[in-house]
């Protein structure tokens, strides 16, 4: 892998990423569990952190800056009398072995601590069975979340020779204290209302049916000055501010930004530079709480891996809010906005539901077009970690004197995520994209688009991402019954900087090229600002200026406005991302349906002489196959490697007068159970 290509690389990336191994110095770490900590056996993920001596191991675990050495291992049916041992490590057995980051000699002095994120068994309504960490008002952290087991932090020296370190899980991370009166306990948090900031939470029937357990979604509702709950005649447009886990905070820094909070509460924007005070826009601003099993938010859409979160929010939570608060429940008065993850959610919410929302103001959104998934040409590259010329692909960057400095590569960040979870369960960025954009694998977990160790891209898996490629989705539904070419014209506003720290400008540029190439230069309003990095409001506007922009759009597109939003563009026929379609195409049933056994192409009985032709069957992308002929129920000849789609030949010999023949193919893949499949049997007789 080439590490340099005219770009500066931060010191953490100067040495190309290698696989970390705890056992390079014959080091073993044994972790037991204290009395009365567990109520039964559990599955989960152990995370072991070696931090610099005297440093809190959780102080900095970020991929771009951590000084720690971190290791992870899955445990199965771990109980009171069990000991989990971490030693060695390597890329070939991520399901049961040790994953480590980064690679250095272990000799030195450290503060060491271990954590165990417990998994809960879930049997989903489509028949799939998975083991996942369900968050509980903590925003689904990748380590040390509610319910996690922890050991005391211990200062010690690693000698560099054979050594055994013993730790004990002796405590459990507690639930945050309840202060509100919401249902559902700690799920989605529990907060007390204030005069302007109200909290709601509902049990989602749709999500609960999918997951086979009670599931909740919530919202933080910021009311404008002068709001009177009893005045049903005065109603307000709504700005849905999409973001990561918001906890108890209000949107736009309400309750944390003193100046904004004071101005919002008074309904008066203080004048600056001699300008007079002016009234604040009269909006209700809503932030959703939808922490999910794979991340701190669900991405607000219906997915095969996380279920009908889009329907839970749009068809259950929003109607509940409309019933309880004085909103204008019309598309023109419902605006989506957000940045980064929230940028993608806001754009997707409008694009999938133009019948429900009026417009989106989406800033530096996650990849809108997978021709540029961050910096990965996902449809054309063979590897997600390096280009054809061998250059590493960056994931996180900064700029110094207008020179790009790569802080982490895609390979480095993916390998870092493997410390915290396999099968896309790290609760981190690349893994949640697998869960949101992709289908289910046969193992029940997200069908990953590439090998997380090597970066090899699986084109068939990538095909299942296309319904979530918003550029492709719009183009594919441009002039059919959804008629998105007319329905969405003038309703999409996107902003990004050319120096986006996560390379998200590439996806925006590809989206603009696709949709404005079809609809003309003003079909979508796309702003790509030279030199700007990740962050800030839409077009880097000051907050009150931006909120006024949104308010003006609503007024202009109201029934009495200058350009009313026509009801012919908000019909239900334009709706997409229907859960029944999503689960049919990408759920457990679809995973089962795409599997095929090996086949012999002849009828049940043939004469000896002709060459027998066989295929290996169909398997999930990334499964490595080995085959063997079975003659009269016994293996015949050596195992040989095959690939899906290969035509396999067998030439009968005169050794047997008459015999039965079948092909046995064994498939292996990281985080899948090894599986052997037999073909049909044919009987072969001599001429």
Regions found by a protein language model. Name each.
Residues 52-94, 100-583:
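Non-catalytic cap/lid and distal C-terminal segments of serine-dependent acyl enzymes
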Residues 16-26:
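N-terminal signal peptide
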Residues 42-43, 195, 215-216, 618-624:
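Short proline/glycine-enriched turn/loop motifs at strand-loop junctions of beta-rich domains
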Residues 581-687:
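Ser/Thr/Pro/Gly-rich low-complexity disordered regions
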């Amino acid at each position: 892998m080439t590490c340099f290509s005219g770009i500066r690389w931060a010191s953490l990336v100067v040495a190309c990423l290698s696989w970390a191994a705890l056992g390079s110095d014959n080091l073993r770490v044994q972790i037991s569990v204290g009395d009365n900590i567990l109520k039964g056996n559990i599955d989960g993920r152990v995370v072991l952190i070696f931090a610099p001596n005297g440093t809190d191991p959780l102080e900095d675990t970020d991929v771009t800056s951590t000084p720690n050495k971190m290791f992870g291992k899955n445990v199965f049916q771990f109980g009171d009398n069990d000991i989990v041992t971490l030693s060695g490590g390597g890329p070939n057995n991520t399901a049961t072995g040790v994953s480590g980051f980064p690679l250095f000699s272990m000799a030195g002095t450290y503060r060491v601590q271990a954590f165990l994120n417990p998994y809960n068994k879930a049997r989903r309504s489509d028949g799939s069975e998975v083991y996942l960490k369900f968050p509980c008002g903590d925003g689904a952290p990748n380590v040390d979340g509610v319910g996690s087991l922890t050991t005391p932090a211990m200062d010690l020296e690693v000698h560099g020779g054979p050594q055994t370190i013993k730790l004990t899980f002796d405590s459990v991370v507690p639930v945050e204290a309840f202060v509100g009166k919401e249902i559902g306990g700690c799920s989605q948090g529990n907060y007390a209302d204030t005069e302007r900031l109200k909290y709601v939470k509902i049990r989602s029937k749709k999500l609960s049916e999918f997951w086979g357990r009670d599931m909740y979604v919530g919202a933080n509702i910021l009311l404008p000055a002068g709001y009177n709950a009893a005045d049903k005649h005065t109603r307000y447009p709504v700005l849905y501010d999409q973001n990561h886990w918001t906890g108890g905070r209000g949107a736009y820094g309400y309750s944390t930004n003193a100046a904004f909070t004071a101005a919002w509460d008074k309904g008066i924007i203080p004048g600056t530079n001699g300008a007079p005070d002016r009234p604040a826009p009269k909006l209700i601003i809503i932030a959703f709480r939808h922490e999910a099993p794979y991340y701190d938010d669900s991405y607000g859409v219906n997915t095969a891996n996380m279920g009908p979160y889009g329907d839970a929010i749009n068809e259950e939570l929003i109607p509940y809010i409309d019933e309880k608060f004085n909103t204008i429940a019309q598309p023109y008065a419902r605006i989506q906005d957000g940045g980064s993850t929230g940028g993608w959610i806001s754009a997707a919410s409008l694009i999938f539901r133009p019948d429900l929302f009026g417009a989106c103001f989406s800033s530096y959104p996650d990849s809108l077009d997978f021709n540029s998934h961050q910096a990965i040409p996902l449809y054309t590259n063979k590897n997600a970690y390096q280009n054809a010329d061998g250059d590493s692909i960056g994931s996180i960057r900064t700029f110094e004197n207008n020179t790009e400095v790569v802080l982490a590569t895609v390979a480095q960040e993916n390998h870092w995520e493997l410390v915290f979870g396999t099968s896309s369960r790290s609760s981190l960025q690349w893994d949640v994209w697998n869960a949101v954009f992709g289908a289910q694998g046969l193992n029940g977990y997200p069908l990953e688009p590439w090998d997380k160790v090597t970066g090899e891209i699986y084109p068939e898996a990538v095909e299942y991402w296309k319904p979530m490629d918003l550029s492709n989705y719009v183009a594919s539904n441009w002039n059919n019954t959804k008629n998105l070419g007319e329905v969405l014209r003038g309703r999409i506003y996107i902003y990004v900087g050319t120096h986006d720290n996560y390379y998200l400008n590439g996806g925006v540029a590809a989206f603009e090229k696709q949709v404005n190439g079809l609809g003309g230069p003003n079909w979508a309003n796309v702003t790509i600002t030279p030199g700007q990095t990740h962050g800030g409001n839409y077009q880097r506007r000051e907050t009150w200026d931006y909120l006024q922009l949104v308010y003006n759009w609503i007024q202009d597109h109201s029934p009495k406005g200058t350009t009313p939003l026509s009801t012919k563009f908000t019909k239900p026929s334009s709706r997409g991302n229907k859960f029944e379609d999503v689960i049919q195409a990408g759920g457990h049933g679809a995973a089962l349906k795409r599997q095929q056994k090996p086949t012999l192409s002849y009828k049940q009985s043939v004469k000896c002489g002709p060459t027998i032709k066989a295929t290996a069957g169909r398997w999930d992308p990334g499964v490595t196959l080995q085959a063997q002929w079975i003659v009269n129920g016994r293996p015949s000849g050596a195992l040989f490697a095959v690939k899906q789609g290969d035509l396999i030949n067998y030439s009968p010999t005169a050794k047997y007068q008459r015999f039965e023949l079948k092909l046995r193919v064994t498939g292996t893949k990281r985080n899948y159970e090894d599986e052997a499949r037999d073909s049909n049997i044919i009987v072969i007789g001599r001429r």
